[in-house]
Design a protein with these regions (language model features):
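Bacterial N-terminal signal peptides that target proteins for export
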Residues: 1-13
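Bacterial N-terminal signal peptides
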Residues: 10-22
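Boundary at the C-terminal end of the N-terminal hydrophobic targeting segment
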Residues: 24-27
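Short amphipathic
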Residues: 33-39
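Short beta-edge strand/loop motif at the mouth of beta-sheet-based domains
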Residues: 55-91
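Hydrophobic-ligand binding "helix-grip"
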Residues: 66-67, 86-134, 144
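A conserved amphipathic terminal alpha-helix motif
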Residues: 138, 145-178
Length: 178
């Protein structure tokens, strides 16, 4: 099985497990997507680099501990708790799913360490880049694949707050340059 095929298998398996978990809990559907859109005062090429390179990620989000390989099957690992035990540092094990240069970047994401029951399951994050006049970029982040039940509700509530903060941090990073 190729690495890309394995990625798709892992995603489908994670979503099936989430669905079965939700069904076992009496839920009918997965939780709604999280969608955040920002207009960034930078050209698409700069915003793209901010998301697809370790240096870019470190410039607005993660401390000096990011591993980003912007190819399908490549790593998308950000460590927020550098001194935490292995598996509890950040997005260890998360992978890039799809890359359409300067248009779309898709990666896996996991629950924070405080929610261990679903930490090995993954959601997907889609970033869509749209060029605007005056060297600006409309960036839309869509995070989906949340199951239902208490742990998934905690995870979703966390990222309902976290993703807008991350996007705001990116916006400020480029506003500071303008």
């Amino acid at each position: 099985m190729t690495r890309v095929s394995l990625l798709h298998f892992r995603l489908i398996l994670a979503m099936l497990v989430a669905g079965f978990t939700a069904a076992a809990a009496g839920a009918q559907t997965l939780a709604p997507d999280i969608v955040v859109t920002k207009v960034i005062n930078a050209p698409v090429s700069d915003v793209w680099k901010a998301w697809t390179t370790a240096e870019g990620i470190e410039s607005f989000w993660a401390p000096k501990a990011a591993k980003v390989e912007p190819v399908p099957g490549g790593a998308f690992e950000l460590w927020f708790g550098v001194n935490n035990p292995e598996g509890l540092r950040g997005s260890e094990g998360c992978l890039v799913h799809s890359v359409k240069p300067m248009e779309q970047f898709v990666f896996e994401w996991n629950a924070p360490p405080e929610i261990p029951a679903i930490r090995k399951l993954r959601t997907l994050v889609y970033l869509d880049f749209k060029p605007l006049p005056d060297n600006r970029t409309e960036l839309t982040l869509r995070n989906f694949g949340y199951g239902t039940g208490p742990d998934w509700a905690k995870n979703k509530a966390y990222f309902d707050q976290a993703w807008p903060a991350v996007m705001g941090s990116l916006e400020k990073r480029f506003a500071a340059k303008g």
